[in-house]
Amino acid sequence: MSNRVIIFDTTLRDGEQALAASLTVKEKLQIALALERLGVDVMEVGFPVSSPGDFESVQTIAKTIKNSRVCALSRALEKDIDAAAQALSVAEQFRIHTFISTSTIHVESKLKRSFDQVLEMAVGAVKYARRFTDDVEFSCEDAGRTPIDNLCRMVEEAIKAGARTINIPDTVGYTVPSEFGGIIQTLFNRVPNIDQAVISVHCHDDLGLSVANSITAVQHGARQIECTVNGIGERAGNCSLEEIAMILSTRKGELGLETGINAKEIHRTSSLVSQLCNMPVQANKAIVGANAFTHSSGIHQDGMLKAQNTYEIMTPESIGLNRNNLNMTSRSGRHVIKHRMSELGYGEQDYNMDVLYEEFLTLADKKGQVFDYDLEALAFMEAQAETDDHYKLQQLVVHSDSTEGSATATVKVAVNGETITEAATGNGPVDAAYKAVARASGCEINISSYQLSAKGEGQNALGQVDITAKYREQNFHGVGLATDVVEASAKALVHVMNLTWRADKVADCKQRIQQNKRELGGV
């Protein structure tokens, strides 16, 4: 049996299900490219039949990704498989992933069928998917609670039908490692054609055991792990990709297993997913948390000074978190910024140097020294910018009355190239700024959540504001970044306004297409 574990990333499918606001196609493509750099073997990027937006994002990613296999999910229904195949047809290499529930509670309560009927549907779906590709994965949903005789029978028949990967999910995160390892071992002992497929596992974290269950599974013969960056996902989340990658790397001598993951891309990928998904990483999160390589105990610090491996089983550098002694100030030239971006893992194609350097100088003039996290934050915001923004914040001036708690904001907002100046009074500076921007733009946005975080340390740290806003029954996520919290808040609002403007344009375009179809049909 091979010692290579296939890493199947489902950040853009299962992970996205946890988000308050859906990612845009551009944001999904950014994450897909980061996953490709990270070295994932397979990336599951959506559920094409679920919506036109999901279909478009799967198709866009499938056209772009070259080094990872692109996968799409489908139920055990021909219409789902057709949509997946159509969206993936432009990919250099792709996989169709079809699934159906197999546990008694799901079969009887959700599907309201007999197990034999479900088995027939599964076999039919695998055979149908094989018409489009040899790479078909089949999942036994809620396998962790499926009677073992039924599970063995389902796996055997799915392999006979042509599935080349069989996924055993712990869908509700219910099993413990000894139990889950036993399920995998039983499949290898009792399914006669098990050697004709790769056994995969997909573990949820409801009891905090997703990583432990996944490691136990590969110790018992599974050779694919399904996971997400930062462990994001439905309910309590999924198995964490970075934890799996570093466990298999750090304990390679004991486990004898390896992956194709480029660990030096872990920190960068984790940060990107956290920012785009508006899901901060908890400080004590293994591998990528802010405290993962921080030592505060005097005894620990003393040991670290004597020998780093006294209290570190891996280094920050191993996940791409470099210790940098290079001071970047307003006197730093373009070559310094380019060199530092290269050391941080960014290629010239990942950012616009002219825009980034201009933003860097503005920030350096404000705070003096610019750090790595500042530079990465600026690169992130530059990557989010669009050339066709309908709204642009040109100026913001705020006056606050600390005795009454009121504030007045004056803004200049460019609306389709025309500058409009407005002022408003509000209950604090952020409220005043939002009211002024709304007046200037004529765009009313209902904000459902507001989150402020610091990007860096000290009083000059960049502030990042993430807002979720509801517009026409849809959630949109906006991000703003500035050393001034009120300015960051206004930028986040303008970001959302541009997203809603584009959504309206798309809706109008679809309406015109439908109208043209109706008119042509009536001729």
Swiss-Prot record:
Pathway: Amino-acid biosynthesis; L-leucine biosynthesis; L-leucine from 3-methyl-2-oxobutanoate: step 1/4
GO molecular function, one term: manganese ion binding
EC number in record: 2.3.3.13
An example Gene Ontology CC term for this record: cytosol
Keyword Lyase: no
Annotated positions binding Mn(2+): D14, H202, H204, N238
Location of the Pyruvate carboxyltransferase domain: 5-267
InterPro entries hit by this protein: 2-IPM_HCS-like, 2-isopropylmalate_synth_dimer, AIPM/Hcit_synth_CS, Aldolase_TIM, LeuA/HCS_post-cat, LeuA_allosteric_dom_sf, LeuA_bact_synth, PYR_CT
SUPFAM superfamilies for this protein: 2-isopropylmalate synthase LeuA, allosteric (dimerisation) domain (SSF110921), Aldolase (SSF51569)
Alphabetically ordered keywords of this record: Amino-acid biosynthesis, Branched-chain amino acid biosynthesis, Cytoplasm, Leucine biosynthesis, Manganese, Metal-binding, Transferase
Subcellular location: Cytoplasm
Pfam families: HCS_D2, HMGL-like, LeuA_dimer
Single GO biological process annotation from the record: L-leucine biosynthetic process
Superkingdom of the organism of origin: Bacteria
Signal peptide (from-to): none
Necessary cofactors: Mn(2+)
Region (Regulatory domain): 392-523
Catalyzed chemical reaction(s): 3-methyl-2-oxobutanoate + acetyl-CoA + H2O = (2S)-2-isopropylmalate + CoA + H(+)
Subunit structure: Homodimer.
Stated family: Belongs to the alpha-IPM synthase/homocitrate synthase family. LeuA type 1 subfamily.
Function (record text): Catalyzes the condensation of the acetyl group of acetyl-CoA with 3-methyl-2-oxobutanoate (2-ketoisovalerate) to form 3-carboxy-3-hydroxy-4-methylpentanoate (2-isopropylmalate).
Protein name per the record: 2-isopropylmalate synthase
Native source organism of the sequence: Shewanella pealeana (strain ATCC 700345 / ANG-SQ1)
Encoding gene, per UniProt annotation: leuA
